[in-house]
Design a protein with these regions (language model features):
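Preference for protein termini
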Residues: 1-295
Length: 295
C-alpha cells in the first residue's frame, strides 16, 4: 500500500536504499564488466549483418516468495505433463481430435504438425523434455502463461549467469535471504537426458547438437555442453551408419551416441526426413530415433 515494498521484498529494498547513487553505479559497472569477462552474449540478426550484443542485466532483483513459487512450479509441472499428453495423443490415437475437443484441421493443417512422427511413442511418453514457458505477472498480482516454447527453448544459461553476477555485485542479498539454487540446472538436464538412453550405461554418450557459432544462442549451447560434460557437435560431426545407430566422428574413430540434445529447428535436423537442402542436421537421424537406437 502507498508504494511501500511487499514484506518479502523489504530486505532487498532496504539494502538498495542504503546504497548511494555512486555505489549503485559502481555495482552496475561491475556487473557489466563481469558480463564482458564471461563472454555472455547473444546475436541480433539484421539486414546489415549479425551483431553480437552483451546480455542486458538488471541489477535490481525480482523477489518471489517460496510459497508463491512452489505454487507456480506445481502449475508449470502440471502444464508440461498436459502438453506432453496432448502431443502423444496427436501422434498416436488422436482421441482429442476424434472427440471434437480440438478441430482436426487446426492440428493436421498446421505447418508444425510433422506426419513423420505419426505412430511414434518416445521414452517415458515424453516429447518435450525441456519446456520454455514465458510467465507474466498481471495487474492482479497473479502469474499468467504468455506462451509455451516446446520446440527449441532457449535462455536458461542467462538465468544461471544472472544469478552468478548478482552474487558478485550484491553479495549482501544472499546473506539476508534463503534463496533457491539455480546452478544445478546443467546436472538436472544431464540426468533428464541420461534417463532417455536406449542403452543401459552408467554414463551414456550425450551430445549437444548446435547449428554453429553464428547461431544467436551459441553461448548457451556451449555453456550447457560444458556444464553437463557433453560434447558440443554440429551436424557434420555425426552420421548414421547401416545399423541405424548415430555415431560421432572423433580422432580415435567413431563413437556411438546415445542421446542428442537438439538445439536446431526440426525442419533442419534431418535432410532425409524434412528439408532436403539442410546442411545443419544429420541424415537418418529420424530413422535412428524411430528404430529406438538414439534418443
Amino acid at each position: 500500500p502507498r508504494g511501500s515494498p511487499r514484506i518479502n521484498a523489504r530486505r532487498a529494498v532496504n539494502l538498495l536504499q542504503s546504497l548511494s547513487v555512486e555505489e549503485m553505479a559502481s555495482r552496475r559497472e561491475a556487473a557489466e564488466l563481469a558480463i564482458r569477462e564471461l563472454g555472455i552474449s547473444f546475436t541480433v540478426y539484421t539486414e546489415r549483418g549479425n551483431i553480437d550484443r552483451a546480455w542486458p542485466f538488471d541489477i535490481i532483483p525480482r523477489v518471489i516468495p517460496a510459497k508463491e513459487w512452489a505454487k507456480v512450479s506445481k502449475g508449470l509441472t502440471q502444464r508440461s505433463r498436459a502438453l506432453n499428453l496432448f502431443i502423444n495423443d496427436i501422434y498416436n490415437e488422436q482421441k482429442i481430435l476424434k472427440d471434437g475437443v480440438v478441430p482436426a484441421e487446426i492440428v493436421l493443417d498446421s505447418p508444425n504438425y510433422k506426419s513423420q512422427c505419426q505412430g511414434v511413442s518416445p521414452t517415458h511418453g515424453v516429447w518435450a523434455h525441456i519446456c520454455g514457458t514465458d510467465l507474466v505477472r498481471n495487474i492482479d498480482g497473479k502469474f499468467y502463461v504468455l506462451e509455451d516454447n516446446l520446440r527449441v527453448p532457449s535462455g536458461v544459461s542467462y538465468m544461471v549467469e544472472n544469478r552468478e553476477i548478482t552474487k558478485r555485485v550484491l553479495p549482501e542479498l544472499f546473506e539476508n535471504y534463503s534463496i533457491l539454487p539455480v546452478d544445478d540446472y546443467p546436472s538436472q538436464l544431464y540426468q533428464t537426458l541420461a534417463s532417455l538412453s536406449p542403452r543401459d550405461r552408467k554414463r551414456p554418450c550425450i551430445v549437444v547438437l548446435t547449428p554453429g557459432i553464428f547461431n544467436s544462442a551459441y553461448f548457451e549451447h556451449a555453456f550447457l555442453a560444458q556444464g553437463m560434460g557433453a560434447e558440443l557437435v554440429e551436424g557434420s560431426d555425426l552420421f548414421v551408419d547401416d545399423d541405424d545407430c548415430v555415431y560421432m566422428r572423433t580422432v580415435d574413430g567413431p563413437v556411438r551416441v546415445d542421446v542428442v540434445y537438439r538445439r536446431i529447428d526440426e525442419d533442419f535436423m534431418d535432410p532425409e526426413a524434412f528439408r532436403e537442402d539442410s546442411v545443419l542436421g544429420v541424415a537418418g537421424l529420424m530413422r535412428s530415433w524411430k528404430a529406438g537406437k538414439v534418443a
